[in-house]
Amino acid sequence: MLTIDEFHETVLSGHYASPADHLPARPLKKGFRAWWRFYASGLARVVAKGIRVVWKGNVTLKLFSELAYDMTRVVEVTGATVSFDGFDALRKLKGKPFVVVANHMSLIETMLLPAGVFAANDMTVVAKRSLTKYPGFGKILASCNPILLDRKNARKDLADTLEQGTALLKQGVSILLFPQGHRAEVFDPRKFNSLGAKLAARAGVPLVPVACKTDFARPGWPLKDFGPVDPSRPVRFACGQALDPTLPQRDLQKACIEHISARLTEWGMGVVKEQEENNVEGN
């Protein structure tokens, strides 16, 4: 099994695909056993590990990095393959701050994508404040110095993200955000706002788009965050080239949408076709 340092180095080489010794000899099929292994056995164990560290009061962003890699392993142990492609684009940014924007398909990218980003630099996330109220997970999230939004006042959320995000970026911490706001299996560019482009331009740091295919886990009912898992569905992340923050904001937004749309289409996922040119401007 790869150590976390070996994993990071492989990710920055440009291609990581789950090694054979990371996967079970007999992958589980979609059903209760896969659900149990992922949530009750895997996720619960990782959350418990994080809580123990938080209780001891010795929390650093390294914990966030370790837990993200642990969750990558949980997905693999359940039987799904995980791949990170194109992250060699981050090698030249290693140790430097940048902004990452990604589509929001499921809970999985919030847990696994940081594993790839941490390969290049420390990072934190923009998240809903309500997530900090989740048992266990909320305490871990709150300890990682996230930018928390109430999602009640769009103007205030924008101001908070730009102010707090710029301060963190100046401290050398990268920022990951999901401009869609809500999870959606079908990518609609009109709902992918330009907050990431605004933040990168304000702070003068590169903007990096990442496409995520994470339909391995789908929303459930009555508990949205504990839906069915299907190990036959690979988890994929594809990083685009770092974008110059001095480019016009419209061009930054367009480049991000084009990268994400192209990769999702390549993977057979749904993408809403833009009907009007101004759709790429975001909200």
Q: Where are the predicted features?
A:
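Catalytic core of membrane glycerolipid acyltransferases/transacylases, capturing the structured
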Residues: 37-55, 94, 98-153
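Residue-level preference for the first positions of well-ordered beta-strands
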Residues: 97-99, 172-178
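Hydrophobic/aromatic ligand-binding patch that stacks against planar heteroaromatic rings
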Residues: 116, 140, 167, 198-199
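Short, glycine/acidic-rich beta->alpha junctions
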Residues: 105, 109, 157, 188-192
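Membrane-interfacial amphipathic helices and adjacent loop/beta segments
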Residues: 56-88, 120-163
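Membrane-anchoring hydrophobic helices of lipid-metabolizing enzymes
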Residues: 1-97, 111-112
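A cross-family acyltransferase "interaction/gating" segment
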Residues: 137-138, 174, 185-251
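Short glycine-rich anion-binding loops that position phosphate/pyrophosphate groups of nucleotides
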Residues: 104-106, 154, 180-183, 213
